[in-house]
Amino acid sequence: MKIIATNKKAFSDYIILETYEAGIELRGTEVKSLRESGANFKDSFCRIKNGEVFLLNLNIPQYRNGSLNNHDPERPRRLLLHKKEIHRLLGKVKEQGLTIIPTKIYFNNRGLVKVEIAVAKGKKKYDKREDIKKREINRRIREYLKG
């Protein structure tokens, strides 16, 4: 498994409740661009529309060697999930405060592009501060035990 990009901000801004692996519908130049330069998760999220899951605002830069038929960098991309998973996601999103966010995009062992999406709940400011305090305490304990 070769990781292309991870959404580091998702882990600091959200509490991850459940993760799913989804295929993603891409054009040829998008796959080439992912192999070459990666992707940007800034402000990306998932929406369920007409029984299909779409990944919005994922920026895959245009392929450098592409022609006029190059792709739009921020076009909506369909995620490939089983119907049962889509219904489960729909039920979770209808709960108050839950959202679907992408956490990782990678090539699996067979060379296919996969996206790891997560059902998450947004953190409040005090939750973020608490996490920072815990990390700082753990770091100090490790330093103290080390010597």
UniProtKB/Swiss-Prot annotation:
Which Pfam families has this protein been placed in?
Answer: SmpB
Entry-linked InterPro entries? SmpB, SsrA-bd_prot, SsrA-bd_prot_CS
Q: Looking at the keywords, is Lyase present?
A: no
SUPFAM superfamilies in the record, alphabetically? Small protein B (SmpB)
NCBIfam families membership:
PRK05422.1, smpB
Task performed by this protein: Required for rescue of stalled ribosomes mediated by trans-translation. Binds to transfer-messenger RNA (tmRNA), required for stable association of tmRNA with ribosomes. tmRNA and SmpB together mimic tRNA shape, replacing the anticodon stem-loop with SmpB. tmRNA is encoded by the ssrA gene; the 2 termini fold to resemble tRNA(Ala) and it encodes a 'tag peptide', a short internal open reading frame. During trans-translation Ala-aminoacylated tmRNA acts like a tRNA, entering the A-site of stalled ribosomes, displacing the stalled mRNA.
Known PROSITE patterns for this protein?
A: SSRP
> Source species, please?
Thermosipho melanesiensis (strain DSM 12029 / CIP 104789 / BI429)
Q: Which CDD domains match?
A: SmpB
- This chain is encoded by the gene named smpB
User: What's the protein here called?
Assistant: SsrA-binding protein
Molecular function (GO) terms for this protein are: RNA binding
